[in-house]
Amino acid sequence: ADTAQRALAQIRTMGIALSPCIVPEVGKPTFHIEDDEMEIGMGIHGEPGIQVEKMKTADETGRLILETIQRDIPLEAGDEVSVMVNGLGATPMEELLLVYRQVHRLLDEQKVSVFMPHIGEYATSMEMAGLSVTIFKLDEEFKELMRYPASTPFYTNANK
């Protein structure tokens, strides 16, 4: 439990929605945004975000997410992080890769290295387009634990 609490203190995630989630029991969108807007900071279960802005490029989106995360968990030159770019279910892999490229580029400029990046669909929402970025500030113990094999519905790591 102590290791999990230490990890939790070093992890931050921020999501961007390009379309709302539709919960099957309700049958309607959980929030509304226009076609040229994005919901910033929305929840994985379709909860509305903290603000709505005009649609941004993948590079602008990556910068916005990383800058917002770093206001809450500052990173310094020499730090090492794991980055997860999670597609919410209706976002093409190419878009996820573009956002990752920008996040990696910005971290590299800050002399922060990336360990075991993850790009794909890990936790999705019904009919939602968008993505989330998770930054996990690592120490040697966390790096060792990340190398362990894992197999769950949301995450598989085949390392041995």
Name each model-derived stretch.
Residues D2-L98:
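Mixed-charge interfacial surface used for oligomerization/domain docking
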